[in-house]
């Protein structure tokens, strides 16, 4: 920006400088927001509102918001959510954040061409599976991906902030559920969330 202010760059080069600066500002804002969320979670200051809602409808609404973004990234998608009602107690904001973080992780890191979300349910629990066909995660990285600030790509150019998956895990735990990951390098990654029907 100093180069722009001092008129060292002009025209198309100036526009590119401004575009890069705006992108970095957006990433910084996103990082601060996510970091603030993690701090509140870590300190036990996050307030949750558990309400009875239809998990299937909520999942459909979340995915409907994601479809344009997936299409803009040339990702094909497969969404399998039962048409039946599945009433359970969840914090809808937290559940939305869980799915958003998993899908954002795929967009940012996986280099995938396909993503899927599958919801299946029993009387006792709901199973939500988010999968991609991307580059996968190495066996050495896999045990650590839910740790705070952990990034599989250790280069300085690594995208993301290393908080998305750890926040997702914390939010799943708040629902007394579990989240696991399985991955085959070069073939893709599968995240499986198990949520009990009754909290």
Where are these regions (language model features)?
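Short alpha-helical segment of the dimerization/phosphotransfer core of two-component systems
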Residues: 23-28
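Conserved catalytic submotifs in the C-terminal HATPase_c
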Residues: 49-53, 71, 76-86
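A conserved beta-strand-to-alpha-helix junction within the catalytic ATP-binding
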Residues: 49-67
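Short helix-loop "hinge" at the ATP-lid/N-box region of the Bergerat-fold HATPase_c
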Residues: 105-107
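Acidic ATP/Mg2+-coordinating residue in the GHKL
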Residues: 132
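Short conserved segment of the HATPase_c
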Residues: 137-149
């Amino acid at each position: 920006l100093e180069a722009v202010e001092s008129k060292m760059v002009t025209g198309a080069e100036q526009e590119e400088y401004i575009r890069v600066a705006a992108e970095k500002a957006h990433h910084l804002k996103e990082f601060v927001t996510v970091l603030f969320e993690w701090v509140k979670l870590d300190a036990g200051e996050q307030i949750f509102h558990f309400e009875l809602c239809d998990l299937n409808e909520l999942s459909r609404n979340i995915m409907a918001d994601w479809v344009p973004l997936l299409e803009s990234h040339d990702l094909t998608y497969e969404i399998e959510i039962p048409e039946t009602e599945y009433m359970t107690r969840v914090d809808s904001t937290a559940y939305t954040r869980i799915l958003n973080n998993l899908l954002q992780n795929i967009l940012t890191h996986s280099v995938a061409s396909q993503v899927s979300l599958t919801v299946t349910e029993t009387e006792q629990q709901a199973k939500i599976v988010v999968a991609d066909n991307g580059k996968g995660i190495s066996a050495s990285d896999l045990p650590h991906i839910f740790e705070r600030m952990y990034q599989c790509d250790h280069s300085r150019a690594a995208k993301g902030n290393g908080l998305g998956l750890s926040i997702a895990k914390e939010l799943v735990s708040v629902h007394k559920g579990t989240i696991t990951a399985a991955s085959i390098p070069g073939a893709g990654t599968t995240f499986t969330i198990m949520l009990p029907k009754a909290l």
